[in-house]
């Protein structure tokens, strides 16, 4: 289980993102902006205060869930098969070497962008169902940050508020406080 070189230039990262956007049907501009916000286009970025890592700063559980569920569609079946979901819903990789390899894939620009596209596509479907419309890119980013359920609650907050439609960023600020 080898991980490709993470020392790639911004044009190579942008190329990986463009390919992921085309393959997953996700907006290139959205994936590019999210990578810029999350990691400054650095595939090897690691958050100092959480398990978040890689181009899109996936936390461990979100990464494992995304690889488990979407990985087989993108040639990552061997990795997906190594991931198990426990009765508590948490994902784990019992084999330490396999876990290291799977978590290392977050630092591969091509794999990370592909999984971000699949994750975004899934979030968009869940949000469309919850909101009754196509989600905005701001709502998709809230889903990247809080998960689709959290972003769906953001839509509910906006709908049930003072009648004024708040932006997704206003909702995040209010929620975090």
Go through each PLM region and give its residues.
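Export/targeting segments at the very N-terminus of extracytoplasmic proteins
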Residues: 1-41, 106, 110-114, 118-131
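Extracytoplasmic
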Residues: 26-29, 53, 135-137
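Alpha-helical, low-charge segments enriched in small hydrophobic residues
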Residues: 36, 50-51
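Extracytosolic helix-loop segments that constitute the early lumenal/periplasmic catalytic or substrate-binding loops
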Residues: 41-42, 71
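Short, solvent-exposed loop/turn and secondary-structure capping segments
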Residues: 45-47, 68-69, 154-157
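Active-site-surrounding "flap" and adjacent substrate/cofactor-binding loops of secreted or lumenal enzymes
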Residues: 52-65
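Alpha-helical segment that forms one wall of the substrate-binding/catalytic cleft
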Residues: 64-134, 139, 145-153
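Catalytic and substrate-binding regions of cell-wall glycan-acting enzymes that process beta-1,4-linked
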Residues: 136-177
């Amino acid at each position: 289980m080898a991980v490709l070189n993470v020392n790639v230039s911004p044009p190579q990262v942008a190329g990986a993102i463009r390919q992921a956007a085309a393959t997953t049907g996700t907006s290139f501009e959205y994936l590019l902006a999210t990578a810029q916000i999350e990691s400054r286009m650095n595939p090897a970025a690691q958050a100092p205060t959480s398990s978040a890592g890689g181009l899109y700063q996936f936390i461990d559980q979100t990464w494992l869930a995304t690889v488990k569920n979407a990985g087989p569609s993108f040639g990552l079946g061997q990795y997906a098969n190594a991931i198990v979901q426990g009765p508590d819903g948490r994902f784990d990789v019992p084999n330490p070497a396999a876990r290291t390899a799977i978590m290392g894939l977050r630092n591969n620009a091509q794999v990370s962008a592909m999984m971000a596209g699949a994750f975004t596509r899934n979030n968009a479907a869940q949000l469309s169902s919850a909101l009754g419309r196509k989600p905005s890119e701001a709502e998709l980013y809230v889903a990247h940050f809080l998960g689709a359920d959290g972003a769906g609650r953001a839509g509910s907050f906006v709908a049930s508020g003072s009648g004024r439609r708040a932006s997704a960023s206003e909702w995040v600020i209010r929620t975090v406080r």
